[in-house]
């Protein structure tokens, strides 16, 4: 359902030697303390193990974190996770996208709750205590039950930590960071003609999610963030607007919009 998967077919991969050189150049020129592997699905990169092993050797002496965002839980490798944790643990990011199995099937996410929980258990067993979960609000056919499912799934993952990791082996308190963005219909995708929620509806959905999280047994272990509704509405206009939008953007610039987030 995401635009990238529709527009950029077929799948193409960067040369692993090129990525290694990029990593070295960026670490030497920026002094950053974390390097991230960013793609639509990092865990599907065919040379991931080789690349991570190289980064381990490169980053260990500099005490640089390695971050693996955009992981598909069903493709996640315990071996890769074990290698990354040898430097410094930051957080792991998973993207269930929806709180219920029904809605995940609607958007063709292809993840079951069993697979999600198994992936989280692997993370906890690997020594991680901080897991980020990405969801989307306002998806086509969404119901209140789907929204509450976000809180329930987050709670199950938090509870899984205590079930998976013995007390004597816990290196810290578990924290689940549940983040929601708002669905924005994009051209050239299966949902390009789907209805987009209003700002008020976005806020209502976010507040419902927050309330549902507060009702969970492990709510103190769950932190909730959501995307700005105002910015999401603007993104919707830009996504489906035509060339007439150019004059609007120019006018906004002339009125002082220079470094605004949108």
Predicted regions and their residues:
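Radical SAM enzyme core and accessory elements
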Residues: 216-262
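Flexible helix-coil linker/hinge segments at domain or subdomain boundaries
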Residues: 162-169, 210-225
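Core structural elements
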Residues: 174-184
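Canonical Radical SAM [4Fe-4S] cluster-binding loop centered on the CxxxCxxC motif
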Residues: 2-17
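Acidic, Ser/Thr-rich peripheral helices and adjacent loops at domain boundaries
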Residues: 84, 91, 196-210, 245-257
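Short glycine-enriched, charge-decorated loop/helix-capping segments at active-site entrances
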Residues: 106-111, 192-198
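Conserved SAM/AdoMet-binding glycine-rich loop
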Residues: 24-175
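Contiguous mid-protein beta-loop-alpha structural module that forms a pocket-lining wall or clamp
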Residues: 145, 182-186, 199-201, 212
């Amino acid at each position: 359902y995401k635009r990238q998967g529709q527009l950029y077919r077929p799948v193409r991969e960067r040369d692993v030697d090129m990525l290694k050189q990029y990593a070295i150049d960026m670490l030497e020129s920026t002094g950053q303390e974390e390097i991230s592997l960013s793609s639509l699905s990092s865990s599907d990169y065919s040379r991931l193990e080789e690349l991570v092993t190289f980064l381990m050797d490169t980053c260990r002496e500099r005490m640089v974190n390695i971050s693996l965002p955009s992981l598909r839980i069903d493709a996640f490798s315990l071996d890769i996770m074990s290698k990354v944790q040898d430097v410094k643990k930051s957080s792991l990011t998973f993207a269930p996208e929806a709180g219920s199995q029904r809605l995940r099937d609607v958007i063709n996410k292809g993840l079951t709750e069993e697979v999600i929980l198994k992936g989280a258990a692997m993370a906890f067993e690997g020594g991680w205590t901080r897991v980020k979960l990405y969801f989307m609000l306002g998806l086509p056919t969404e119901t209140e039950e789907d929204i509450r499912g976000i809180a329930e799934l987050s709670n199950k993952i938090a509870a899984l930590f205590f079930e998976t990791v013995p007390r004597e082996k816990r290196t810290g308190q578990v924290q689940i960071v549940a983040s929601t963005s708002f669905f924005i219909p994009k051209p050239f995708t299966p949902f390009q003609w789907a209805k987009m929620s209003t700002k008020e509806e976005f806020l209502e959905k976010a507040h419902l999610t927050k309330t549902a999280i507060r009702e969970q047994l492990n709510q103190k272990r769950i932190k909730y963030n959501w995307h700005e509704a105002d910015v999401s509405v603007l993104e919707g206009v830009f996504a489906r607007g035509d060339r007439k939008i150019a004059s609007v953007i120019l006018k906004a610039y002339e009125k002082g919009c220079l470094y605004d987030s949108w």
